[in-house]
């Protein structure tokens, strides 16, 4: 029997073609792009690792040492005004400083505060805060303002919460993504953006594992260095020391990208300042309102913030019934962060190919659908005893509080996993074909204010209820929250469909 050489050659060609397609499917980065891609990924890893550590820490401190209900007050009365102030400062900086220096300045301010909180403020918080007797007397005389009194009496915890809340939207959403948008083409963004999370999002899993083992790390450090600090103080210092180290690595990585990795063409694109006459803050907001494209992006951010906040409040309140100290609560958050990291990597692998093969809309609509479905499930368990009883009858969970915590954790894991990958990447892709001036200043308003307005909008409603009805709890207002949640998710789905049309038109116009 003879073998036809042409058949062998054809088979070999088919095999090579198959492996080539498989390689492109898994790793669509071209050889000359590897260094650029990996350095951006390292920068993203550091920023997100910090983000997850301080997010867990702020909730652990505020929820266990003040109360879960205080979060709604902080988000509206503290975080939202700070977001507006930060936007005003950023627009001024854009018109006066180099983009690279803006990055260094803002990162340094955050890191300086975290260092002060870890080693000066928190160890002395009892001395710096109001006395318990004074607080109790004020709350007794002004019961409707008791949460404001708590907020001000524990001012350092409140300030830490506000600063930590600004990090993901100022550093990650604004500084990092604006930098990446300016050095990435539309064609590169389709391959780069979903895959940025493939390595960087492992920071979620590692942060979760770190927090889960915080007690063991604390014991090791105490024995190793014979420290006399209190258990919870040392836990907070350990977390924030890691934050400081990662922050320094992020600054160094950003410097290397600017001076060693990017070529002159990319450096020219890193001019955040518009070439036209500098715009005032009022003109910047007017530009935002005049752009339907930016308004729709802001709508997505607002809806996401409202939907997530409506579920997180009751969920965190339920969690404090079981996890009563900052270290215990941080370990609990670490456990669901670990699962979030695993599912995020899964979404990264699927998401990069969803964008390339099924298009922008399919990738963008997955997150609101996941949030909607899992959120409805949580509220059903939380509000309707018969539904919770059905779960008890079919699963091993028998504690109603544990059922709510578990369903809420599942909701958070799936929502955050899809948000960190599909939602963030498709949102950033929507900015790429825009005019440079709209991309820069419109993005500042949409990202910072849009995100915070979403969280603060629902926070205002919740805080208003707690002011009017001091005895109200998350359980008693949960049905109301569910109705608002449904309306928000339906609006989110509509805005996604409308933005898809705008995105396609912008790409055609830019080509």
Swiss-Prot record:
One term of GO molecular function: ATP:ADP antiporter activity
Entry keywords, A to Z: ATP-binding, Cell membrane, Membrane, Nucleotide-binding, Transmembrane, Transmembrane helix, Transport
Plastid listed as a keyword: no
InterPro entries hit by this protein: ADP_ATP_car_bac_type
Location(s) in or outside the cell: Cell membrane
Residues that span the membrane, as ranges: 34-54, 70-90, 102-122, 157-177, 192-212, 231-251, 296-316, 330-350, 361-381, 390-410, 453-473, 476-496
Annotated GO CC locations: plasma membrane
Pfam families attached to this UniProt entry: TLC
Membrane topology term: Multi-pass membrane protein
Coiled-coil ranges (or none): none
Entry function: Provides the rickettsial cell with host ATP in exchange for rickettsial ADP. This is an obligate exchange system. This energy acquiring activity is an important component of rickettsial parasitism.
Stated family: Belongs to the ADP/ATP translocase tlc family.
Protein name, per record: ADP,ATP carrier protein 4
Organism the protein comes from: Rickettsia conorii (strain ATCC VR-613 / Malish 7)
Organism classification: Bacteria, Pseudomonadati, Pseudomonadota, Alphaproteobacteria, Rickettsiales
